[in-house]
């Protein structure tokens, strides 16, 4: 069975083809440069870019896989969450393709795709694991069982900014480029992560154990920089970037390891765009090794949004015998995560 996956939840247009847990081919187009001058993603710009890119990207993915559309057995698509107009472009394209081919359509949850993509690199997921999903729009700790069949348990989420969003905003304060994650990562290489003690929110005993908050550290950086400039001093960009990055990585990895311990699982899955950050990865490796946990992190190119991850979760659903979604499937920009299928657990 060959599953074609379509991703369009934000600013990447992705198509991937997966069969039996093996990535056959994928392609990606990004409208990131078009958003750079705005300092963030503009939904209508993203949607227009998806419209222009979806067909060429699909042909490129098929070409890499050495396949034709006639070889596709099922279509999976991100039906939420995400930017409304962006999600709708991918969903409409996937519906049209499924209808034209007479193949089943599976509307999947974007975050389940991030978890499923690791299967393409490291094989089947452990029977139970904790997933730390960290991106521009999401920061969540999830307890996973059988990803295709079981309910996904939310252990905690951010109560304000996602980690990736905080990276973008701090990068803007420091005059670095967009997107902020890679810019801060590069700047931090020459900095001292202990130079400035930025706050670690929700770290007290009485705070939610697995809740996150990055609005405070973002504001703390802005105020520190403003005070330095008002005093006529030069802003040590590398030190600020490294200290901010350390604060975020510390909270993310500490809470993720604690979740594994408390729930009796021995594997941590680190996924999402921020999983590409070198300090987050390094600290996760260090803390998982100390705790005797297996750490699974997809290749960097599969950490950010892509079509392969949607094909991967679609492949799991097809092999598990999940019911198809049907062509009346609607987009849900704020879809709650209860299962890999947007409609929730089915078994």
UniProtKB/Swiss-Prot annotation:
Chain ranges passing through the membrane: none
Residues that coordinate or bind Fe cation: 110, 114, 305
Biological function: Required for the formation of a threonylcarbamoyl group on adenosine at position 37 (t(6)A37) in tRNAs that read codons beginning with adenine. Is involved in the transfer of the threonylcarbamoyl moiety of threonylcarbamoyl-AMP (TC-AMP) to the N6 group of A37, together with TsaE and TsaB. TsaD likely plays a direct catalytic role in this reaction.
Catalytic reaction annotation: L-threonylcarbamoyladenylate + adenosine(37) in tRNA = N(6)-L-threonylcarbamoyladenosine(37) in tRNA + AMP + H(+)
Binding-site residues, substrate: 133-137, 168, 181, 185, 277
UniProt EC number: 2.3.1.234
One MF annotation (Gene Ontology) recorded for this entry: N(6)-L-threonylcarbamoyladenine synthase activity
The protein's name in its UniProt record: tRNA N6-adenosine threonylcarbamoyltransferase
PANTHER family in UniProt: TRNA N6-ADENOSINE THREONYLCARBAMOYLTRANSFERASE (PTHR11735), TRNA N6-ADENOSINE THREONYLCARBAMOYLTRANSFERASE, MITOCHONDRIAL (PTHR11735:SF6)
Cofactor (UniProt): Fe(2+)
Keywords: Acyltransferase, Cytoplasm, Iron, Metal-binding, Transferase, tRNA processing
Chief location category: cytoplasm
Keyword Metal-binding found: yes
UniProt remark on cofactor binding: Binds 1 Fe(2+) ion per subunit.
Organism: Kineococcus radiotolerans (strain ATCC BAA-149 / DSM 14245 / SRS30216)
Gene Ontology cellular-component terms listed: cytoplasm
Protein localization: Cytoplasm
Coiled coil: none
Pfam families tied to this protein: TsaD
GO biological process, one term: tRNA threonylcarbamoyladenosine modification
Family statement: Belongs to the KAE1 / TsaD family.
